[in-house]
Regions:
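Flexible loop/hinge segments at secondary-structure junctions
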Residues: 1-149
């Protein structure tokens, strides 16, 4: 942290502890592509966690740590990074709003797929997800609302 001019309270040796997801995670793959680029590589020595909640928990407990996770896993006990846009514009803080309007540069959509046109119980479930009740639950869990693409 000291090399980039940042003082982190409680971080005694100023060494950045990088917390990541395991390489079989879609979150890992998306972050790698969106942030590190097609040929980018994670550095050696990352602490690879099983799930997003595990990443957030470790970052919260480790003063020198930095990590990435889905917005729905954010807590009041960690600081979320404001990310610069590729065009050099002002940085954008992560929120449901900036994920929904796609202004947060590393927000990603989540998709649900069906084998053919949904029918029966699957159609009922998808209709419920798009309903006001379903959308309230999605927003309450920290995810952006569902949009038809």
């Amino acid at each position: 942290w000291g090399d980039i001019g940042v003082e982190v309270p409680g971080c005694k040796n100023n060494e950045i502890v990088v917390v990541s997801r395991q390489n079989n995670s879609d979150t890992y793959a998306y972050f790698k592509k969106a942030v590190l680029g097609a040929k980018g590589k994670y550095r050696q020595g990352t602490l690879d966690m099983h799930g997003s909640k595990d990443v957030v928990d470790l970052v919260e407990k480790t003063p020198c740590a930095i990590g990435y996770s889905g917005l729905a896993y954010a807590t009041d006990h960690i600081k979320m990074a404001c990310i610069d846009k590729a065009d050099g514009g002002d940085c954008v803080s992560p929120s449901v709003g900036t994920a929904s309007d796609r202004s947060y540069p590393i927000a990603r959509p989540l998709f649900m797929y069906t084998n053919g046109e949904p029918k029966g119980e699957i159609k009922k479930y998808l209709d419920w997800i798009h309903s006001e009740e379903g959308q309230c639950i999605i927003l309450g869990k920290g995810y952006a609302s569902v949009r038809d693409l």
